[in-house]
Amino acid sequence: MKKIILLLGLTGFLLSSCEEMQQIASQIPTGTGEGIGGVSSMKISEGLKQALEFGVQDGVAKLGKKDGFFKNSMTKILLPEELQKVDRTLRNIGLGSLADEGLKLLNRAAEDAVTEAAPIFKNAIMTMSINDAKGILLGGNNAATNYLENRTSNQLFTAFEPKVKNSLGKVGADEIWNQIITKYNSLTGQTVTPDLNAYVTQQAIKGVFKMVAEKESGIRSNIGLRTTPLLQEVFGLQDKK
């Protein structure tokens, strides 16, 4: 009889303990890491990703227009150091117009290729694990953009490079630069073999990141740019820091 009573008592204790554990668990915020002001780390992460995604959409839309790179002082693709001596040589012999066309077409290729960048960047954003959402939210104006760039640049380069290669041929940049390099090598007796595909890919990706950083900074500093409830809730937290 004592064993039965003891067993019933133990069962009651275990059931009571389970109920208490469930109550405690229900009070723990969802997501990993410490949140801020009642907003979970997971929700902060979602807000940061949404801001980055909006930055990509806005940046790609602007850069993908004619002169989106070429006449934007922040993102214009300039010649790499290796080709600056080629540019000077052409101008010295009266072929400045050919040099101008070569530079312009590098930017035209970026403008054409970047129209296909949005899904590539979006995939990188959505699959990115934000380990310190709180720290990023309370960081500098471009903290989320810098985090994305540091963790996805190689992935983005691999996915975006074929698009740039296609665009270089599409806009005629390959043809013009073959003429330029052939002319330069013939005149100087030197051999210059630039990897324009890799260079334009790198510069185009940098250009998108600059636009994303600008958008992130705007969302952080301008309440009017927080156009969704999630952005308002998450970035409202950094206003109180």
Where are these regions (language model features)?
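Residue-level signature of catalytic and energy-coupling elements of molecular machines
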Residues: G59, S129, I223
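Hydrophobic helical h-region of N-terminal Sec-dependent signal peptides
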Residues: L6-L10
